[in-house]
Amino acid sequence: DFNHPSIFSWVLFNEQWGLQTKGGDGKDSWLPDTQEWVGRCYDLAKELDPTRLVEDNSPCCGGGHVKTDLNSWHMYLPGWKWKATLDEAEAKTFPGSTWNYVGGRQQGEEPMLNSECGNVWGYEGSAGDVDWSFDYHAMIDEFRRHPKVAGWLYTEHHDVINEWNGYVRADRSEKETGLGELVPGMT
């Protein structure tokens, strides 16, 4: 149902996986030929399904877009870092900007969104459920304060093998957020 209020899109590549070539210096690079191929993949996806948004690559770590309907990016930060990061992203996000694009390509009218975010310590080991709740609220509050941020995708709904940043534990049991101390019955 393409009229659903949630955003559904085809994401062709995630975090440049398989798109970069290792050079003689050992560094990965995203070659112009590969960028052109990704653009053709975008065109094909739009041809096959014109009802959906298409994202060429959901970038992180210095990657970027070639041809996309969504100017998205991945970012995992502690709550206190979000304001400065989003201030910078908003300042660099406008038609004609090359921020978050590769090969000299420029942004058009694509909306900006964080397509992968969560609590950074979830990847290194849990600092505790209460800290998870604090950073989660700080992050979401900053997204709401920045009007150019059209949306976000939280990773993930439940804890998995090496990522402890879900809303609930891997066994789907509730996490203790400490909010029950403020509002009885709320975890």
List where the protein language model places each region.
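Surface beta-strand/loop "capping" patches
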Residues: E181-T187
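Substrate-binding/catalytic cleft of secreted carbohydrate-active enzymes
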Residues: D1-S173
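C-terminal domain-tail junction helix/linker
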Residues: T177-L179
